[in-house]
Swiss-Prot record:
One of its GO terms (molecular function) is 4-hydroxy-tetrahydrodipicolinate synthase activity. One of its GO terms (biological process) is lysine biosynthetic process via diaminopimelate. The gene is dapA. Pathway: Amino-acid biosynthesis; L-lysine biosynthesis via DAP pathway; (S)-tetrahydrodipicolinate from L-aspartate: step 3/4. Pyruvate binds at T51, I209. This is 4-hydroxy-tetrahydrodipicolinate synthase. Catalyzes the condensation of (S)-aspartate-beta-semialdehyde [(S)-ASA] and pyruvate to 4-hydroxy-tetrahydrodipicolinate (HTPA). One of its GO terms (cellular component) is cytosol. Homotetramer; dimer of dimers. Belongs to the DapA family. The lineage of its organism: Bacteria, Pseudomonadati, Pseudomonadota, Gammaproteobacteria, Pasteurellales. The active site is at Y139 (proton donor/acceptor), K167 (schiff-base intermediate with substrate). Transmembrane segments: none annotated. InterPro entries: Aldolase_TIM, DapA, DapA-like, Schiff_base-form_aldolases_AS, Schiff_base-form_aldolases_CS.
């Protein structure tokens, strides 16, 4: 049970980036999404992370979207900026552009495609942290990046003052204990896998950076509040209701299904994504509809 609240905790949305039918960021829809999360009790928002299609936005678009998210939030909810890149220089540029923005933290993914060694990952994150005072959250998602940031390396990185936590998306709940052992109990562990998020909180994790939260924000916030209070049986009831969503929102590559689900629920006016991502296939749509019904959202 968490007896005090760390800097980042609870149900944190990996926010989708709404687009209009010209493929441009829809800032009116974005404003409505921010309000939805504030009203629903979401504990923080990640702007332009993986789910926010950071890889297909330019640096200028990334920064503008983050700044608009901050503007819409108006201090009512912490905003974490997705600033990761597979080039260290690009990640540093993004981070520096936000130094005086008021973001609560930066989420920085393990460099993808070029497959750095553990030493390379250490040097990458160290260089980013040294260019800013903004708290840094590491992001490990080997299924996308091709590289696994090991607990031993996380332990080394935790010695850098403004590297405060990790989004761990391997789905391996044993990582909670391993990372806490290497980095210390105060190092923030946030699950990046909805399916095992509650289990990781039972083992000492402080929250979930969630895809499901985009469309079931109130339920995810309540589940995490119960878990943080040690009321795991009650939290499990909510998690059971969302279990099909946790799974089926990955029936095609994220964020394809969750963006379509948000459209189906009227949270965004269009399910449009930028190429090479395409809208959810017709054959997958009934499964998402069933999952939404099982969760009581339709």
């Amino acid at each position: 049970m968490t007896t005090h609240r760390p800097l980042f905790y609870g149900s944190i949305t990996a926010l989708i980036t709404p687009m209009n039918n010209h493929g441009e960021v829809d800032f009116n829809a974005l404003k409505k999404l921010v309000e939805y999360h504030i009203v629903s009790g979401t504990h923080a928002i990640v702007s332009v992370g993986t789910t926010g299609e950071s890889a297909t936005l330019s640096i200028a678009e990334n920064v503008k979207t983050i700044l608009k998210t901050l503007e819409f939030a108006d201090g009512r909810i912490p905003i974490i900026a997705g600033t990761g890149a597979n080039a260290t220089s690009e990640a540093i540029t993004m981070t520096k552009l936000l130094n005086d923005s008021g973001v609560a933290g930066c989420l920085s993914v393990v460099p993808y495609y070029n497959k750095p060694t553990q030493e390379g990952m250490y040097q990458h994150f160290k260089a980013i942290a040294e260019c800013t005072d903004i708290p840094q959250i590491l992001y490990n998602v080997p299924s996308r990046t091709g590289s696994d940031l090991l607990p031993e390396t996380v332990g080394r990185l935790s010695q850098i003052a403004n590297i405060v936590g990790i989004k761990e998306a391997t789905g391996d709940v044993s990582r909670v204990a391993k990372i806490k052992q290497m980095a210390g109990e105060d190092f923030i562990f946030l699950s990046g896998d909805d399916a095992t998020g509650l289990e990781s909180m039972k083992l000492g994790g402080q929250g979930v950076i969630s895809v499901t939260n985009n469309i079931a924000a109130a339920d995810m916030a309540k589940m995490c509040e119960l878990a943080l209070a040690g009321k795991f049986d009650e939290a499990e009831i909510i998690n059971d209701k969302l279990r099909a969503l946790h799974k089926d929102l990955f029936i095609e590559s994220n964020p394809i299904p969750v963006k379509w689900a948000a459209y189906k629920l009227g949270l965004v006016p269009d399910p449009i994504l930028r190429l090479p991502l395409t809208t959810l296939s017709e054959q997958a749509q009934p499964k998402i509809i069933n999952a939404l019904k099982n969760a009581g959202l339709l």
